[in-house]
Amino acid sequence: MRFWRERGRENKEHMVAPLCGQIRVLVVGDSGVGKSSLVHLIVKGSSIVRPSQTIGCTVGVKHLTYASPASSSSIIKGDSERDFFVELWDVSGHERYKDCRSLFYSQINGVIFVHDLSQRTTKTNLQKWAGEVSVTGEFSAPLSSGGPGGLPVPYIVIGNKADIAAKGGTNGSSGNLVDAARHWVEKQGLLPHSDELPLSESFPSNVGLIMAAKEARYDKEALTKIFHMLIRRRYFSDELPSPSSAWSLSHAPSQRLDEGTSDEDQFYKRTSLREGDAYKYNTLPQHNLMQSPTLYPQQPPDRYNYAIPRFSLSSVEETSNGNGRSKRMDINV
């Protein structure tokens, strides 16, 4: 019997897989620029002929492995190579979802801005998208300084429909946001000089990344490096440059997405009176306990004449029957 218990314990230990991490990346831009085609190309590795219109938001998941150096992390420990899931949140750019898009702007690790190379207005509107995400979004491991519109997380600008723009004679569209993205990424030092984007000579230096999702043409290596950088920022903060470096970043403590406590619970936990006495001063609300029934329910106060002194019914009847005259015999009227 003891042998089978030890054998079962060993099998359970071997079956336990290392924890998988996850990062969340928003994909935003005007309606019709090809965000859904981009997400499908990144996740599936192939183009989609007729993508359907996005209703609210759709999520695509990309699996990646990240090989950590010998330095250990405060969040993930163990083997040097781990599995990670990149959540690509494709947010609809239609105006009908403008009032509810902020529901999807939570726990953001990075942003992908997409514009149409054949329509210059879609690139000009990226500044509006950056401001919308910055104002209404909630970010994980924000940067010390913000990008365009105050965006506090890393981002990349991608120009789609390069095939259509080439046929129409449209050059790589110019815009202030892409130039600001290039200067901001270089200033923050998010990537070493050897890894700066774009990685191909066919990409002009002031346009960002160019792709043609319909023809399944995009820089897979560049996007993979972006995702690895976001993973490193959230889970392996000790790999980032030291504060003494010119390209250093100051990081806020990252929060796991699988934590079950709400913001209200965290507030009560921080405001406990003593840390040592967890039983007496634990102010976390007990959500799993039912409220005890009241033995003597209190009657609600009367809204009318609650300040007037109350009389017994018998005295009122005697007064009404005697026409207001007292029945005491010792009083001479």
Curated annotation (Swiss-Prot):
Key word Zinc present: no
Superkingdom field: Eukaryota
Organism: Arabidopsis thaliana (Mouse-ear cress)
Compositional bias segments (type: Polar residues): 242-253
Binding site for GTP: 29-36, 90-94, 160-163
Segments for region (Disordered): 242-265
A Pfam match: Roc
PROSITE patterns cross-referenced by the UniProt entry: RAB
Renumbered residue ranges of the record's region Small GTPase-like: 11-288
Lineage: Eukaryota, Viridiplantae, Streptophyta, Embryophyta, Tracheophyta
Molecular-function GO term, any one: GTP binding
Family affiliation: Belongs to the small GTPase superfamily.
This protein's UniProt keywords: GTP-binding, Nucleotide-binding
Protein name: Small GTPase-like protein LIP2
